[in-house]
């Protein structure tokens, strides 16, 4: 008996080291080894001393007003709060799954008192029997001989790690969204002020044309042309008044609270609002993009689930064991000779399951293939977002300079047309065309500047930036990794 028990224990220890989880191999990145090159992309310096993902958002965003708004959003945004709670929930799920590897030991106390009728009693007379017991032990503890429970534990661990990356992704998205909403608000405020100024100019021209018309110098056509310019500017003014209000509402939603009243003075759109970040190499994205890391953890979780599905084909052994004391009298539980013990192993060997085990294994493998495709798609999406950002960086500088030159030329055109109209050399149609050309060019300059800024924000996010508040240097990273530093 002792030899059989010892053999069983040795076999359990040996088999407990078995794992049926397939060896994990990271899929090859389905993108080029370098970002696109060409006229649109400018010069890419390659590997960066400090990766963009390690540059703190307080260093990237130079506007103190925007910095404070991002801080408010990180404290109050509900989506970010849900992401953090999801991490806690999956951490608890992992702890639950890990606990199944160990026996659950508890104390059981029981007591029964039963009356048997005479026809069931061995003596032929009614009898009352009593039994009391206290035991310490475990019930139905599964010996993880083929790694099923360890596979489920590893799967839960990878899912927990995936939610951590999802939280990180939610934060980087929130930081970029707050910045975009803030920049959009500033741009629409600039458009609103430009429209007010333009409306004032149109109104002065209309008043001048009205006086000229009253004395018979200007025609009715000139007067109506001036009026159309005024009414068009009024409509545009109402549009930007609405957009500014909606931009503020969108910002409040992202902040999770009202816009603070004591914000510091912000920077203007024409000032240096952002720090240029290095692009690095595509291989950096595999370790820096939280959505890619999340997809990889989900892939590793699916890989672990294959091990659990394989282990289901093998026997499962459960153990119930306890030791304690039993007695007919409650007062005799701890008397000499009242000791008791139970050792009850059980084995379950699947023989016929109507194909369910094979189907479960096929399902686990298909899920892994799905996760491989999702992981590769995440890499491709990241590569495209970075490439688009680099193309925007390489062309917006030239576009903005050309647009500024257009505004300058349009302003000179307007000044000349206004002078010629006032001296009677040219008609009002030329002046109206000059006014509209200048207004359109100024509007487009604001729009182009907003697009340039948002493209830089999106590039920062695409490179994994927005998680750290302060820049993390390589020395700081090394200290974190070295416990003796």
UniProtKB/Swiss-Prot annotation:
UniProt keywords, alphabetically: Antibiotic resistance, Cell outer membrane, Lipoprotein, Membrane, Palmitate, Signal, Transmembrane, Transmembrane beta strand, Transport
Primary residence: membrane
Signal peptide: 1-17
Places the protein is found: Cell outer membrane
Function: The outer membrane component of the MexAB-OprM efflux system that confers multidrug resistance. Functions as the major efflux pump for n-hexane and p-xylene efflux. Has been shown in one study to be involved in the active efflux of the autoinducer N-(3-oxododecanoyl) homoserine lactone, thereby playing an indirect role in quorum-sensing; but has been shown in another study not to be involved in efflux of this autoinducer. Over-expression of the pump increases antibiotic and solvent efflux capacities.
Subunit structure: Component of the MexAB-OprM multidrug efflux complex, composed of six MexA subunits forming a hexameric tube, binding to a MexB trimer, which interact with the trimeric OprM outer membrane channel protein. The OprM homotrimer forms a 135 Angstroms-long pore. It consists of a beta-barrel, which is probably inserted in the outer membrane, and an alpha-barrel formed by alpha-helices which probably spans the periplasm. In the ground state the periplasmic end is closed, while the outer membrane end opening is 6-8 Angstroms in diameter.
This protein's name: Outer membrane protein OprM
Activity control summary: Export of antibiotics and solvents is dramatically decreased in the presence of the protonophore carbonyl cyanide m-chlorophenylhydrazone (CCCP), therefore may be driven by a proton gradient. Antibiotic efflux is inhibited by pyridopyrimidine derivatives, such as ABI-PP, acting by binding to a hydrophobic pocket in MexB.
Lipidation (S-diacylglycerol cysteine): 18
Regions annotated as coiled coil: none
This protein's GO CC annotations: cell outer membrane; efflux pump complex; membrane
Outcome following mutation: residue 18 to G/F/W: No palmitoylation occurs. The protein functions normally in antibiotic efflux
Result of changing residue 424 to A: Abolishes complex formation
Domain of life: Bacteria
One annotated GO biological process: transmembrane transport
Induction: By growth under severe iron limitation.
Lipidation, N-palmitoyl cysteine type: 18
Disruption phenotype: Disruption of MexA, MexB and OprM significantly reduces active efflux of N-(3-oxododecanoyl) homoserine lactone/3-oxo-C12-HSL/PAI-1, but not N-butyryl homoserine lactone/C4-HSL/PAI-2.
